[in-house]
Amino acid sequence: MFAGALLLAAGLSSLGFAQKPGLKFNPDKKFKIVQFTDLHVKWQDPRSDIAFERMNQVLDDEKPDLVIFTGDIIYSKPALENMRNVLKTVSDRKIPFSIVFGNHDNEQGATKEELLKVAESLPYSLTADEVPEISGVGNYALTVRSSDGKKDACVLYCIDSNTYSTIKGVKGYDYIKRDQIDWYCKKSAEFTRNNGGEPVPSLAFFHIALPEFNQAASDENAQLYGIRREKACAPALNSGLFTAIKENGDVMGVFVGHDHDDDYAVCWYDVLLAYGRFTGGPTEYIHIPNGARVIELNEGARTFKTWIRTKAGVEQLLPIRIHS
């Protein structure tokens, strides 16, 4: 049986299917994630050199267990080659990675479905389309096993925040749809049930901020850490994901991109709402040094640390404790 499993894995690899690495807390009960966002890479454009430089520097400095790209990865044709080239920066280092889409990725001559296949095909990719029948492309949940490998110790929800509003009379960006929220709630309930009725500590990653980011940032009682140079370009309509998060009691933090001049984090009803740091170069607007957000999870606790890593070093080190 074991030999057969090895042959099957080898056969799949030879057909071009990437093996899916497992995620697990380290023996020190830590697990580190690097979030790259808004690379806006233009094919063979020198202005994107600094994006690759920063990714490599952050990976050298942080040595993460997982990298998550939160959208707007590519910004020119040829789309498939461009996407593959960006993701190989991580894949070639044998670091597990996953992606969610931004509102610009499918504007470069390829569909999200085509781009997803590129991401899925690379070694060390955990990118998936777990539920193709619901809205968006690339909604999936990643599990991080406990250091002893006996249970799911953390869940990472990767969600497509879609692109632009399709409702007549409603301008601006789209929202996470009801069927996507229903999927998250179903998965959350399943993980909670399998964990003896206790919600599994979780994080959520997508591109476009929730409306609650603006609410939290403008609340005089909320402590905001980091840079806020622009209002969150959130959907005009609130579809209720944050309410579902509070009802389920599992997600400790929501991590987004999209707004290049923001990298702040603010706790809102005991959920950290946080931007990544813009990782790209001057192919798009940017008024702060590029970098990345880092998240370090603690096994068996609703606590984590997060900080920004730039060329200059570490900024905004925040120890976060979420009250159940």
Give the positions of each predicted feature.
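Binuclear metal-dependent phosphoesterase catalytic core
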Residues: 22, 27, 36, 141-146, ...
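Active-site environment of divalent metal-dependent phosphoester hydrolases
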Residues: 42-44, 75-80, 99-110, 164-167, ...
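His/acidic metal-ligating clusters that form di-metal
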Residues: 63-65, 155-157, 170-263
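Active-site-proximal beta-strand elements of phosphoester/diester hydrolases
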Residues: 30-43, 153-163, 205, 272-278
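Extended active-site neighborhood of metal-dependent phosphoesterases/phosphodiesterases
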Residues: 84-197, 293-298
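Acidic/histidine-rich helix-loop elements
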Residues: 34-52, 73-81, 107, 113, ...
